[in-house]
A protein has these predicted regions:
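N-terminal glycine-rich phosphate/adenylate-binding segment common to multiple enzyme folds
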Residues: 72-118, 185-199
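N-terminal glycine-rich anion-binding loop in soluble enzyme alpha/beta folds
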Residues: 2-73, 138-168
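Hydrophobic alpha-helical
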Residues: 96-99, 171-172, 183-206, 213, ...
Length: 226
């Protein structure tokens, strides 16, 4: 079937995100074409670290620069850049927009469906857990307390570990191994940067079933527009 419906994928880092889209495209319906946008496109890592440095009270996000380096920055300060990419994607004729980040976002201006992974991940995890505790992996230790707060607001008790998807699969495997034998319903990899290969490695190391947001989001979008 020919691809004819354009959808936007907006990373809070830089595009293209070939490390992410390879898994996403596999799960998208055949008629969907993914067009990439990056909130940090055109910026250097030094600019990001200087201009978007998180204040103590601000949400911390972790993403990837186009050269593969990890970038850590303020979720609050990146919001206007994400909004600009939403506006651009709509002007380019995209039929729907996925924000490729599991962080929390305020209400943003849009005229086409705007999909945020966090509510999809949290609601599915809550339904699947059936009241049991859920293991969660975030990229950076600085995100643990904010993640605990977000999951608590969604009614889910969590057991949190950290490992960056941008620093290789070994760290993910080691962090997942610390969950071996834990009384958790399953493991959520709480970042769009985690790959299918990392999901499989985490499953082997932890002995837990694993929920991966990038494939969950792709499945939902395909159901909606495929």
């Amino acid at each position: 079937m020919a691809r004819h419906t354009r959808i936007a994928g907006i990373t809070v880092g830089q595009s293209p995100r070939t490390d992410m889209t390879c898994d996403l495209v596999q799960r998208l319906a055949d008629n969907l074409e993914l067009v990439e946008y990056g909130a940090l496109d055109g910026m250097t890592l030094e600019q990001v670290e200087s201009e978007l440095k998180p204040e103590p009270s601000e949400e911390v996000l972790v993403s990837r620069m186009s050269d593969g380096r990890q970038a850590t920055f303020s979720g609050d300060k990146v919001v206007p850049l994400v909004q600009a990419k939403i506006d651009q994607a709509e002007a380019d004729g995209c039929r729907a927009i996925i924000v490729l980040c599991t962080g929390s976002f305020p209400e943003l201006r849009h005229t086409v469906p705007l999909i945020f992974p966090q509510p999809l991940l949290h609601s599915n995890a809550r339904a699947l857990a059936g009241g049991r505790r859920v293991a969660v992996m975030v990229p950076d230790p600085s995100q643990i307390e904010q993640a605990r707060e977000w999951w608590s607001m969604s009614g889910v008790e969590v057991d949190i570990v950290s490992a960056s998807p941008y620093q290789g699969i070994d760290g993910v495997t080691r962090a997942a191994a610390t969950l071996k034998g834990a009384d958790d319903a399953f493991l959520c990899l709480d970042c769009m940067g985690f790959t299918l290969a990392m999901r499989d490695a985490a499953r082997r190391a932890s002995g837990l079933d694993v929920l991966l947001p990038r494939t969950l989001v792709a499945s939902v979008v395909s159901e909606l527009l495929g």
